[in-house]
């Protein structure tokens, strides 16, 4: 069974450690176990750093980075019992900071380093932890920040979901899984 939590639908904020703990406990109580945890939460505020309100910066770091830490720490005991898998999401901007989204790019880079480090720490516990790195994807967050773009220039969310599911079926850990648009004509 799949359980979904979000700020909009369930008022669950990954930046709030207690809310993460409550969400995971509710799933474990209902299902008896947790095999996989996938965290896609992210905030992109596309504006110059010098123009950003400090509270906006803190909220982005709290969601993007501390949300990752919260989910990992709170999911760990459940995933230890099932030798489960944990997936986080980065962005192609993690490899090179980009003007007007310095906080987003830097928190996404931090997620990659976090995943690689924690994968080594938790390998003996049987927990796999990986990071999905989709290229520019057609999402509401993207549209909010960049407007309407031609579909052929964007990765479709379904392709990202398929790559995520394929990753759950592997034994890899500590990896960054790049997801790209299919080549023209494929």
Description of each model-found segment:
Residues 72, 107:
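Active-site helix of classical SDR
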Residues 48-49, 56-61:
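Substrate-binding pocket helix/loop in short-chain dehydrogenase/reductase
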Residues 91:
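Residue(s) in the substrate-gating loop at a strand-loop-helix junction
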Residues 96, 117-127:
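Active-site-adjacent segment of SDR/Rossmann-fold oxidoreductases
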Residues 124, 131, 139, 147-186:
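C-terminal helical subdomain
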Residues 40-45:
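Conserved NAD(P)H cofactor-binding loop of Rossmann-fold oxidoreductase domains
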Residues 52, 97-105, 117, 145:
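Active-site loop-to-helix junction immediately N-terminal to the catalytic Tyr of the SDR YXXXK motif
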